[in-house]
């Protein structure tokens, strides 16, 4: 008596497993009569037999995702290590010598400095850059090729402040 409930339980468990597992029911004609067969969930019906798809690994999207992430990580790490171990050579640039002449100290407020006047300060024409730090930054040394070229002075309106807004509006 005890064996019978165990057999019934095993039979029910087997039926439950068979029903829950997704299977494909296939059939084909042999002569005039159909012949039935069952394939597993990952198999397809192929004529008179079951066959496995060659590209069934495409269903494993997480496998391909992890594989591509691993390849990208390895390539990035290899590139980083290669750049650290073998840094690119520095480009050799030609030597660029910068030389400048120091201006003599300012002798006094009324004394004129020797050399051409500089027109960088809007305070007025003929102002020397000794007291003007902005003009000193853009000063051309006298022995450079640009210093020997004679340039005409800028127009007079460059050294005057702009007219007031009201005057410009009334003129139009």
Swiss-Prot record:
UniProt keyword list: Cytoplasmic vesicle, Endosome, Lysosome, Membrane, Signal, Transcription, Transcription regulation, Transmembrane, Transmembrane helix
Name this protein carries in UniProt: WW domain binding protein VOPP1
Species for this entry: Homo sapiens (Human)
Subunit structure, as described in the record: Interacts with WWOX (via WW domain).
Role description: Increases the transcriptional activity of NFKB1 by facilitating its nuclear translocation, DNA-binding and associated apoptotic response, when overexpressed. May sequester WWOX in lysosomal vesicles and thereby regulate WWOX role as tumor suppressor.
Outcome of mutating residue 165 to A: Reduces binding to WWOX
Tissue: Widely expressed with highest levels in thymus and ovary.
Segments passing through the bilayer: 61-81
Membrane topology, from the record: Single-pass type I membrane protein; Single-pass membrane protein
Location of region: Disordered: 102-153
Any one Gene Ontology molecular-function term assigned to this protein's record: enzyme binding
Record has Zinc as a keyword: no
Sequence ranges on the Extracellular membrane side: 23-60
Family to which the UniProt record says this protein belongs: Belongs to the VOPP1/ECOP family.
Annotated localization: Cytoplasmic vesicle membrane; Late endosome membrane; Lysosome membrane
């Amino acid at each position: 008596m005890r064996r019978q409930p165990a057999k019934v339980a095993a039979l029910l468990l087997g039926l439950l497993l068979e029903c829950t597992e997704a299977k494909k029911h296939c059939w084909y004609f042999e002569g005039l009569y159909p012949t039935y067969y069952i394939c597993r969930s990952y198999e397809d019906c192929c004529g008179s037999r079951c066959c496995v798809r060659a590209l069934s690994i495409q269903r494993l999207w997480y496998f391909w995702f992890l594989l591509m992430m691993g390849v990208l990580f390895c390539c990035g790490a290899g590139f980083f290590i290669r750049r650290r171990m073998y840094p690119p050579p520095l480009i050799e640039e030609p030597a660029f010598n910068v030389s400048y002449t120091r201006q003599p100290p300012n002798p006094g407020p009324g004394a004129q400095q020797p050399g051409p006047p500089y027109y960088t300060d809007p305070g007025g024409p003929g102002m020397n850059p000794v007291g003007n730090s902005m003009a000193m930054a853009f000063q051309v040394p006298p022995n450079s090729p640009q210093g020997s070229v004679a340039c005409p002075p800028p127009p007079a309106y460059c050294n005057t402040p702009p007219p007031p807004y009201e005057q410009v509006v009334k003129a139009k």
